[in-house]
């Protein structure tokens, strides 16, 4: 538990991060910042509750940020608050596997979950849900956004999307859902 900390990983290879009862707030930057453009396994350890939040007014893209493609799994719970921009931001695709527990976006200034770099020419910005219960509340823009001509694949799981922004969407996609 830390109210003034972060996990920063720089790498060039696939990696796995296990969250097992983590409470992490960074008042200036992302709580988790993974600077690796490969596959990032994110295990939510069964029976644990993990809470992430970033600070207000920074320039970062999310409380949980990765350059690569996170694949969430495990029966735990992840609660994320995005006080600067997005709650969860992946510059490539993002996947919730069949074994994923619960992911709760408590609040986000912009998108609850954002996939993409914002370059409008990258078609690797997909949102994939195969399982889990994903809940997005209090998003300042869209609940889930697959940018850059990305697609959305909804193969299972549960999406609870509570649109609160006047011009926001539950699911926003530049290509096909």
What do these predicted regions represent?
Residues 1-177:
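A composition-driven surface/loop motif
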């Amino acid at each position: 538990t830390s109210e003034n900390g972060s996990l920063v990983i720089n790498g060039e290879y696939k990696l796995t991060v296990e969250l097992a009862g983590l409470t992490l707030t960074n008042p200036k930057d992302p709580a988790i910042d993974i600077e690796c453009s490969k596959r990032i396994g994110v295990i939510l350890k069964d029976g644990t509750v993990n809470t992430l939040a970033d600070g207000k007014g920074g320039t970062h893209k999310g409380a949980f940020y990765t350059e690569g493609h996170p694949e969430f799994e495990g029966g735990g719970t992840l609660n994320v608050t995005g006080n600067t921009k997005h709650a969860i931001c992946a510059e490539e695709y993002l996947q919730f596997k069949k074994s994923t527990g619960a992911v709760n976006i408590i609040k986000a200034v912009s998108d609850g979950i954002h996939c993409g770099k914002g370059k409008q020419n990258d078609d690797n910005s997909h949102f994939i849900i195969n399982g889990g219960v994903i809940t997005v509340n209090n998003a300042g823009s869209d609940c889930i956004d697959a940018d850059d001509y990305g697609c959305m694949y909804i193969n299972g799981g549960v999406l609870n999307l509570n649109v609160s922004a006047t011009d926001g969407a539950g699911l926003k996609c530049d290509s096909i859902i």
